[in-house]
């Protein structure tokens, strides 16, 4: 029997938390709330804007580091990100290892006019309707957390609700699975969720094998404009940044620096 990985531990907690929420609000009730929510914003259009986009993340903690920042007002932080030029705001909602919550998602959705990504470990259809009910326009699906049948089903359900799925991969094999499932937006995570180790070369190995019509997002490992430019040179359409922003003294300026680099004439252009 293989030893449990970090991802296994996270998923076990997520399943328990989803079951607890569903015991309070049924699947039929959350579906009704999702249907009654305002229509989702066009996250795909935001990702296709010229230059390298910045997805800025509201992130309180991580399994690898622990607490990252005390975020007293997630809405204020999200507004700073938007003011800095972020195209999409990502909100971590996993409770046990990332200290996130749906309350953070609600606060951010009410505060910004750009699309919002719910970043969590989706293992049940309930979470997809829950994301839409709380105003998400985009949803993370992690290939390593789902078998192929579940991945395809979750992707179809996400798109049926008008959201865009950010399908996260770590290996060439996972990228193949994402493509076979029909992913239109693929994120390559430099951090291995099994071990929490970071490999910034992961993106440059996987991105060349992705079709040009697929949006490519580099996740993790962005510490500043130099990293954004390196990812752009490897074919990124956008970068997702969390830790570097929440730990900066001026998140608006930190986002603006990345946006400036991503839209500068010397920045490599996405191959579309």
Swiss-Prot record:
EC number(s) from the headed UniProt entry: 4.1.1.48
Q: Which PROSITE patterns match?
A: IGPS
Write down the superkingdom of origin.
Bacteria
Gene3D superfamilies registered for this protein in UniProt: Aldolase class I
PANTHER family tied to this protein: INDOLE-3-GLYCEROL-PHOSPHATE SYNTHASE (PTHR22854:SF2), TRYPTOPHAN BIOSYNTHESIS PROTEIN (PTHR22854)
Under Pfam families, the record lists:
IGPS
Reactions mediated catalytically = 1-(2-carboxyphenylamino)-1-deoxy-D-ribulose 5-phosphate + H(+) = (1S,2R)-1-C-(indol-3-yl)glycerol 3-phosphate + CO2 + H2O
> Which pathway?
Amino-acid biosynthesis; L-tryptophan biosynthesis; L-tryptophan from chorismate: step 4/5
What is the gene called?
Answer: trpC
Q: Which InterPro entries match?
A: Aldolase_TIM (IPR013785), Indole-3-glycerol_P_synth (IPR045186), Indole-3-glycerol_P_synth_dom (IPR013798), Indole-3-GlycerolPSynthase_CS (IPR001468), RibuloseP-bd_barrel (IPR011060)
Biological process (GO) annotations? L-tryptophan biosynthetic process
Query: Which NCBIfam families does the entry link to?
Result: PRK00278.1-1 (NF001369), PRK00278.2-4 (NF001377)
Name assigned to this protein: Indole-3-glycerol phosphate synthase
Q: Provide the alphabetized UniProt keywords.
A: Amino-acid biosynthesis, Aromatic amino acid biosynthesis, Decarboxylase, Lyase, Tryptophan biosynthesis
Q: Which family does it belong to?
A: Belongs to the TrpC family.
UniProt GO molecular function = indole-3-glycerol-phosphate synthase activity; phosphoribosylanthranilate isomerase activity
What is the species of this protein? Mycobacterium leprae (strain TN)
């Amino acid at each position: 029997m293989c030893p449990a990985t970090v991802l296994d531990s996270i998923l076990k907690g997520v399943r328990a938390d989803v079951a607890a929420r569903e015991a309070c609000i049924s699947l039929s009730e959350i579906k009704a709330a999702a249907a009654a929510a305002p229509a989702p914003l066009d996250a795909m259009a935001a990702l296709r804007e010229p230059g390298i986009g910045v997805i800025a993340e509201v992130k309180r903690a991580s399994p690898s580091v622990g607490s990252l920042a005390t975020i007293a007002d997630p809405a204020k932080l999200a507004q700073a990100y938007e003011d800095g030029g972020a195209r999409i705001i990502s909100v971590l909602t996993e409770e046990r290892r990332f200290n996130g919550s749906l309350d953070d998602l609600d606060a951010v959705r009410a505060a910004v006019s750009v699309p919002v990504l719910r970043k969590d470990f989706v293992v049940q259809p309930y979470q997809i309707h829950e994301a839409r009910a709380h105003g998400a326009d985009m949803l993370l699906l992690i290939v390593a957390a789902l078998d192929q049948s579940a991945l395809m089903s979750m992707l179809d359900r996400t798109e049926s609700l008008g959201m865009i799925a950010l399908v996260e991969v770590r290996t060439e094999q996972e990228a193949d699975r994402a493509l076979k499932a029909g992913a239109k937006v693929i994120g390559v995570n430099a951090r291995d969720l099994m071990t929490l180790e970071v490999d910034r070369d992961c993106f440059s190995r996987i991105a060349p094998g992705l079709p040009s019509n697929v949006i490519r997002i580099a996740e993790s490992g962005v510490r500043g404009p130099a990293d954004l430019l390196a990812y752009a040179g490897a074919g990124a359409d956008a970068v997702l940044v969390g830790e570097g922003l929440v730990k900066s003294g001026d998140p608006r300026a930190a986002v603006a620096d990345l946006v400036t680099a991503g839209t500068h004439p010397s920045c490599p252009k996405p191959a579309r």
